[in-house]
Amino acid sequence: MKKLLIALMAATAALSLAASAEAADKLKACWVYTGPIGDFGYSYQHDQGRLEVEKALGDKVETAYLENVSEGPDADRAFERLAREGCKIIFGTSFGFMDPEVKIAKKFPKVMFEHATGYKTAENLGIYNARFYEGRYVLGQIAAKQSKSGVAGYIVSFPIPEVVMGINSFMLGAQSINPNFKAKIVWVNSWFDPGKEADAAKALFDQGADIVVQHTDSTAALQVAEERKLHGFGQSSDMIKFAPHAQLTALTDEWGPYYISRVQAALDGTWKPDNVWLGIKDGAVKLAPFTNMPDDVKAMAEATTKKIADGWNPFTGPIAKQDGTPWLKEGEVADDATLLGMNFYVKGVDDKLPQ
């Protein structure tokens, strides 16, 4: 009996050691989201990318995430917590996480960090972004074709270059169809606030807009469009199920392939901090199926999407600034540095840019 007990204890210990070794062999990849994964928008889409990592890399990885993390001291604590809990690669998915990631990356030099939509790097901190503005040009063209009032309502979060270039690209697309098209802007000073987003949509519709665009994360604005029997666009993910009659298309973010490649690089020992800006041609920016529009508008949108995928830049001159002063000459193309520092509107935007 004593020999049997010793044998059982030895077997249990062996299994425990094997399990510990297996856990140690796994790479822990972690994400920090500014909103809830149930926003069905920006944070949701990043989390879909995390799930794709799990599916693609299987038992090689363990993943974890923190959601609803505020930009500021809360973000400092979130990144430090994940680093202390054994995360080997951490993705911060909001612009406002930039300084917290820089700070925590210095404290944990052996942890790999990546930051979405920012511009600061370090020896163990890379940055990645998507050219959302490419898709917004197509949205602008569709809006100009579908709008009866010639006015779009645009709901936005914070006056950072990514948001400003999106507004401008949308306007350039719209004015390529209707030179007199206008956009009214409402700043809600939040990435995710369904109440504010809904109120903004109602106010814009009351002011004469008949189509709504957003650079915020909830489905609220599009649902208001559905209630008003008007139109709008999904943001970050396909929101058609929330507004089956209102959604014309959605600007969707496809993070999965990028996340898989970066986590695989971490596994292989080949990860290095990088500066990546992916677009339509890379499959990182996509447009959901074109719906609730005539065939000719759909064909136009498809043609423009292909044109951009083939290398055409929406910020190709001639383009004038909001006050009418020339910015880009005929055929001149804005470089990435200019876009990433964009702090002015193009002609046609009905708003004073907050400073």
Tell what function each PLM region has.
Residues A7-S16:
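Bacterial N-terminal signal peptides
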Residues L17-A23:
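Sec/Tat signal peptide C-region and signal peptidase I cleavage site
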Residues A24-Q355:
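A residue-level marker of the well-folded mature domains of exported/periplasmic proteins
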Residues M1-L4:
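Positively charged n-region of N-terminal signal peptides that target proteins for export
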